């Protein structure tokens, strides 16, 4: 059985040893404090690379004969290069696969390295978890930013979180600076910028109490999710969409379904479904390892 290491990079570095698409011995986390969500932002690229390699070495537990290493990062990744990373801007332009491979070889690990988008890693993890590695899986990750994950891997950009969902000139809260983006409405960072006097949790609580401004935003938030999902359906067809990430707690499924019904009217495209799944770091790590194994032809 192949022994691979999966790593995911977001607010923390999470790493785990994966054997036969299952996590072995739990996850390794950096930093150790789960509430420290700013540590990676302050680290330069070289320090991040060294940290990732240290975590890989620890979860390998002395056995350096790994089949592959998969590292999932937030941003636009092509051919091992991070071309854009709004939430970890120091990584922009980093030749991540090359840097990681070099550092791992210095530590005695010569396994092939795959660098992929973190949402794609989650989609691969969901496919492995469901035993559907031969099926199309699409995932929206609702967190600091918005990720769109797709499995199996298909060449393309797939930056679904930057889908344009409004033409309102005032919608400029996306981390990339673009106007009208889904992430500029739904992303946690964007919501904090919009409501400088309230946290996102307080906004949705106020919406429940009938606050007009907050309820209007709740509607906009769900319209953005519906619009991006409907666009994906109109481009690639219906099927199941999974919603995950720490902000799935804000999803009002009846409201979302109502907007979806208004936006998807062609009967052949109405066989879609939407399911909320609990945020799972384990699924992310397994998906990173599965993607690396497939890229290595294992």
Q: Where are the regions that the model predicts?
A:
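Glycine-rich phosphate-binding loop and adjoining helix at the ATP-binding site
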Residues: 35-46, 65-69, 75-136, 252-267
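Glycine/GP-enriched mid-protein hinge/lid loop-to-helix segment characteristic of carbohydrate kinases
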Residues: 3, 14-29, 37-41, 103, ...
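Adenine-nucleotide phosphate-binding core of ATP-dependent small-molecule kinases
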Residues: 34, 38-64, 192-254, 272-284
């Amino acid at each position: 059985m192949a022994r691979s290491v999966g790593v995911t990079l977001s607010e923390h570095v999470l790493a785990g040893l994966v054997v036969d698409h299952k996590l072995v011995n739990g996850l390794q986390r950096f930093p150790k404090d789960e509430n420290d969500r700013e540590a990676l932002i302050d680290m330069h690229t070289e320090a991040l690379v060294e940290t990732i390699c240290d975590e890989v070495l620890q979860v390998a537990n002395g056995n350096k004969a790994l089949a592959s290493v998969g590292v999932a990062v937030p941003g636009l990744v092509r051919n091992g290069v991070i071309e854009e990373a709004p939430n970890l801007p120091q990584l922009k332009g980093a030749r991540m696969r090359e840097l990681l491979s070099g550092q791992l070889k210095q530590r005695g690990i010569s396994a092939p390295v795959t660098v992929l988008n973190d949402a794609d890693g989650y989609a691969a993890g969901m496919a492995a978890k469901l035993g559907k590695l031969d099926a199309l899986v699409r995932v929206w990750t609702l967190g600091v930013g918005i990720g769109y994950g797709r499995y199996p891997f298909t060449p393309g950009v797939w930056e679904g979180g930057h889908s344009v969902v409004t033409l309102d000139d005032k919608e400029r809260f996306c981390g990339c600076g673009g106007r009208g983006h889904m992430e500029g409405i739904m992303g946690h960072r964007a919501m904090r910028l919009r409501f400088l006097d309230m946290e996102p949790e307080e906004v949705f609580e106020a919406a429940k109490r009938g606050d007009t401004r907050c309820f209007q935003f709740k509607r906009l938030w769900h319209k953005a999710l519906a619009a991006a999902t409907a666009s994906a359906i109109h481009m690639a067809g219906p099927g199941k969409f999974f919603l995950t990430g720490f902000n799935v707690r804000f999803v009002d499924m009846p409201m979302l379904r109502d907007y979806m019904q208004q936006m998807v009217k062609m009967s052949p495209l109405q066989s879609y479904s939407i399911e909320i799944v609990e945020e799972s770091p384990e699924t992310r790590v397994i998906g990173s390892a599965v993607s690396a194994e497939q890229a290595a032809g294992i």
